[in-house]
């Protein structure tokens, strides 16, 4: 298995975080690995784009998941820790974190577009996430979206911030 930290499907976001790779390079890499018989596990970061680009981040990530056809996809939620440059941007007011509800809305939108042509194991069960999700794309997209919407309506279902630390 090859693990790939793609972070986002948006070239704007990838540039913003100095990823050093483009969306197309990441897609091509996953496709080559899968074609060679190697399973891939690709990780994306919820909340990475902030409030200005969250919709683009969600849609472009969802369509990237659909296009790359990885064996596994997982989501983590952004947590700013030293020495991350984004932490300094946050402290200086140049970057704003999404609220938990905004992170869930972003994930719903991403799942709407994450329709790979072959089954893909999806996990969002990392300690950083407000809600744990597990399913198979595209078969379980609607049930995962429904779970997220329930959590958006009842904040008591969200993981407490104290338990999101790594």
Predicted regions and their residues:
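Conserved non-cysteine loop/helix-boundary elements of the Radical SAM core domain that shape
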Residues: 1-37, 48-68, 88-101
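Structural preference for beta-strand elements that scaffold enzyme active sites
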Residues: 1-3, 39-43, 72, 119-123
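Ser/Thr-centric signal marking residues that sit
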Residues: 40, 61, 77
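Short glycine/proline-centered loop/turn elements that form peptide/ligand docking sites
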Residues: 44-47, 77
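Short, small-residue-enriched loops and turns at beta-alpha junctions
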Residues: 47-53, 81, 130
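Auxiliary Fe-S-binding modules of radical SAM enzymes
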Residues: 66-166
